[in-house]
Amino acid sequence: MKILILAFLASLAKAQEGCGIISRKPQPKMAQVSSSRRGVYYNDDIFRSNVLHLTQDYFLPFDSNLTQYFSLNVDSDRFTYFDNPILDFGDGVYFAATEKSNVIRGWIFGSTFDNTTQSAVIVNNSTHIIIRVCNFNLCKEPMYTVSRGAQQSSWVYQSAFNCTYDRVEKSFQLDTAPKTGNFKDLREYVFKNRDGFLSVYQTYTAVNLPRGLPIGFSVLRPILKLPFGINITSYRVVMAMFSQTTSNFLPESAAYYVGNLKYTTFMLSFNENGTITNAIDCAQNPLAELKCTIKNFNVSKGIYQTSNFRVSPTQEVIRFPNITNRCPFDKVFNATRFPNVYAWERTKISDCVADYTVLYNSTSFSTFKCYGVSPSKLIDLCFTSVYADTFLIRSSEVRQVAPGETGVIADYNYKLPDDFTGCVIAWNTAKQDQGQYYYRSHRKTKLKPFERDLSSDENGVRTLSTYDFYPSVPVAYQATRVVVLSFELLNAPATVCGPKLSTQLVKNQCVNFNFNGLKGTGVLTESSKRFQSFQQFGRDTSDFTDSVRDPQTLEILDISPCSFGGVSVITPGTNASSEVAVLYQDVNCTDVPAAIHADQLTPAWRVYSTGTNVFQTQAGCLIGAEHVNASYECDIPIGAGICASYHTASTLRSVGQKSIVAYTMSLGAENSIAYANNSIAIPTNFSISVTTEVMPVSMAKTSVDCTMYICGDSLECSNLLLQYGSFCTQLNRALSGIAIEQDKNTQEVFAQVKQMYKTPAIKDFGGFNFSQILPDPSKPTKRSFIEDLLFNKVTLADAGFMKQYGECLGDISARDLICAQKFNGLTVLPPLLTDEMIAAYTAALVSGTATAGWTFGAGSALQIPFAMQMAYRFNGIGVTQNVLYENQKQIANQFNKAISQIQESLTTTSTALGKLQDVVNQNAQALNTLVKQLSSNFGAISSVLNDILSRLDKVEAEVQIDRLITGRLQSLQTYVTQQLIRAAEIRASANLAATKMSECVLGQSKRVDFCGKGYHLMSFPQAAPHGVVFLHVTYVPSQERNFTTAPAICHEGKAYFPREGVFVSNGTSWFITQRNFYSPQIITTDNTFVAGSCDVVIGIINNTVYDPLQPELDSFKEELDKYFKNHTSPDVDLGDISGINASVVNIQKEIDRLNEVAKNLNESLIDLQELGKYEQYIKWPWYVWLGFIAGLIAIVMVTILLCCMTSCCSCLKGACSCGSCCKFDEDDSEPVLKGVKLHYT
């Protein structure tokens, strides 16, 4: 079947203003094709590097159904297709085309596609890209025609007028010749129309496809941002047709796939170059939602609470009362004469539509200030009533018409309340209002808000003064009209609303709603509540709005959240499997589809709302895990006695079953009888295991420069901060207390490591110093100075046998041969002989030789000891030399190997540190700039302090700065609270570490799995940064055997219990054995005791589970209603933040190399055979002792003789008398006369 193209007019066709007609055009097949993971694009202009970014925008959801359209000459049904229908644009479009002959030429965007509205044309005419926005007379079948491989006609539109955008892009030559074979080109586009701009994103991929759209991941980059400014609701594709003549054009093979964008959340992964390398559609399935919740592509095994990325609003519901009358603002503002200010007048406005845009867009008003509400929000709000107060004052007095102001006007004429909600509008009327007007200049008391005093005097004294308004007076004294609009918030049905059009009421779907100005997001459902006649909203116990009255139908509607938040995802870990199970907390399985709005979920999510693997638990509904009655190791505790495990099909079940299984944990049958026989497993064999346990006992100490953090360099802020008293001091005091506690934790933990008990050194006793006589108890193997003096000491290298020899020998030399030791199969003796040993062995040798003749050789047996001890000593010398040689050889080889490994490790470490240094240096300046900027951008307003002070007066500026200070103080308080919580956790960990130091290191714990995994043998502590590392040596069961056991045995009416261990039966007899090792013993009175009788007492334990308390949440509505002020916040310049090098330093290769080097270094540890040091003390012979004693006696005698031969009268200060031998003849002495001094000449 041919497609005939006929020109309307030949001249128009030549001018490219004609159109073509297609005869007998079949309807598109509209097959559905999965988008897989295509269509991701850069949705903003911000550069990001090495970061995961969560963004909400309009994206093509992964695995969306794309509709397929063709340009096809002849298909299997003998039809030709030229599919170019008008398609819905929606919130954006994803467009992908597979072709080989450049069939797809462009698009037309618009609304009505006629000349009454503007449309946008973006087409490729084979030489240029044409972009136009005009009122077009579009062709019914817009197309290009190609004749004999060359462009012939452009039948897109007939004419165009009222063009507002005209642009020609690029000059090129498009290959228009038709091609055969597979599709070679895949072009993808995304179109978004936002704020008057049509943004176009594109990517190209070379393919070789016979049909279909390839599965994969694609990222589109921005190419155009066109300021069209038109309404786009639909679009249409422009394609080309081909012919070898100038008529009878036929289509060539091409296909395009379209899908609409949806507002959803994506997580984008950017590499160091700012390129998107991976993406996740957070609403695609439970695992994708979990990855977005924890913001990580890799998820470890466990159960995780998720955030809601599943349901987003689909429509907008706006409901205002059916009011058509316009509010009479013109009568208020255009009154002929305004009253005096003291006699101000009020007008009530109700039952009308208020178009406030006319007011705040007017350029005639000199003042338009709103309090408690933003002018731009008025169009969306409804009020019970609006009051308009009017009066006339001077231009300079307008400032007093505001909440909290003082002055003549505010005190004595017109006063606004501090919580005023409304707008003040003023404009100069110097030419209109002239003459005398009155105001009250004084009054005994000030007026209350909205109080009016019409009197002209007070106690006979006139209180009114006059304004003299003339155009010639200064501006400050000229007449100014003032209108104060007071808004009465909804406490009754709304009568004044903005001019916003209402929409249809949509129920049972997630929508954005606006009821009389109450905005929100939720699901609207029919309610059974009853309202009072004046009631518009309903509130729950937490004072949150949970129901509303529709202002048009007066129907009461419940408002529920769009999503059910109590959803947890169970995963075995993404490294093991992508399979998950979902737990809906506190929900019956029958209610799950309604609770999560399953009809709005993706198909991948919807399978987790119903299905065959549905398991109702006390914790909620578990879907996606197979419930089994068996029990396995609890990998993932879910709660409420439920556990999940992950197994492969080969180790658990037959092929085809789920990999995640869930089961109820049980300690036995609920109705089991006490003392009934039960089976237990008792270890019969063990293996040694070493477990490493790291326990934190301290954390990094921190302090905060409070003033700098809150105020930066702002003097005004610092002065205001002083009013907060000692907050900063208390804050740092708390941080200091945390630091002190960390030191205390460390001290207490490591104080548990006590040294071995040592005997105190007794150096002084009763005034006598024994340090040179008694041995030093701190060195128990050393002898004292006197002992070293009285004995000769010989030190030898010990290959491993000399110490045992010395202990055996003692002081008896005759035991020398008996104390010979075994070493590596040889009998050895130390190569050392004392004089006693030499004398003994010599005597035996001589005696043996002398008696050999007359004892017929039997006496030669006395030579054997001498020969044996010589052989043994030669063996001792030999093995010692061999050990020394082998050790030297190992030292040389391993030292050389260690040196090379150390050199390599230093090189690798240097490379890694170089990388770290580069990143640290690059980030330092950028981080400093960022901190400085952030220090002025925090809290209630997004503005720097200087800007606050410059645009607000002092009082309001201090209020705003006070909010900023309060926000930052709250942040600091939260930080300190987190530190205190962390310190409490550290404290608990330190206490446990101290307990393990006492029980595991200094003792042997009997608690199973407390000191390591298994039964404890010994533990070794090692200090670690901010903690301690325990190396627990344990023995764990390698083999177990099941035995029937009983807690007690009844015999003759008495119950016998084991003193230690358990009773077990081997099938025929009962024994008692240890619980941790099977060592059966006969039951006797020694290992049992008798207690009580055989009666069984069963106790019932209360199993009540209490629900957690729900704290009552205070309502912020009243507070927030006061602060919807008209304050514009300037953008804060954080441009320097892009200077941060947020790249992740990849030093994994260096770390792996270091690990390898460390392994090699460990292998190079020298396992030397230990050479001990053996010291032997040799006693002197008897004659030496005899000479030593005789020498001491001679020394004493000589000392006494010398004393007696001198002229001393005594020796040793009178301790011994020498009077008989020390007295001289008195006659030879000179006379001594008392009191006479003799002089010698």
From Swiss-Prot:
The chain crosses the membrane at residues 1182-1202. Residues 784-805 are annotated as: Fusion peptide 1. A motif (KxHxx) lies at residues 1237-1241. GO terms for cellular component: host cell endoplasmic reticulum-Golgi intermediate compartment membrane; host cell plasma membrane; membrane; viral envelope; virion membrane. Disulfide bonds join C19-C139, C134-C163, C282-C292, C327-C352, C370-C423, C382-C497, C808-C819. Residues 1131-1170 are annotated as: Heptad repeat 2. Its main location: virion. Specific enzymatic cleavages in vivo yield mature proteins. The precursor is processed into S1 and S2 by host cell furin or another cellular protease to yield the mature S1 and S2 proteins. Additionally, a second cleavage leads to the release of a fusion peptide after viral attachment to host cell receptor. Residues 14-1181 are extracellular. Residues 888-938 are annotated as: Heptad repeat 1. HAMAP family: BETA_CORONA_SPIKE. Fusion peptide 1 (FP1) and fusion peptide 2 (FP2) function cooperatively and have a membrane-ordering effect on lipid headgroups and shallow hydrophobic regions of target bilayers. They are considered as two domains of an extended, bipartite FP. The membrane-ordering activity is calcium-dependent and also dependent on correct folding, which is maintained by an internal disulfide bond in FP2. This is Spike glycoprotein. It comes from Bat coronavirus Rp3/2004.
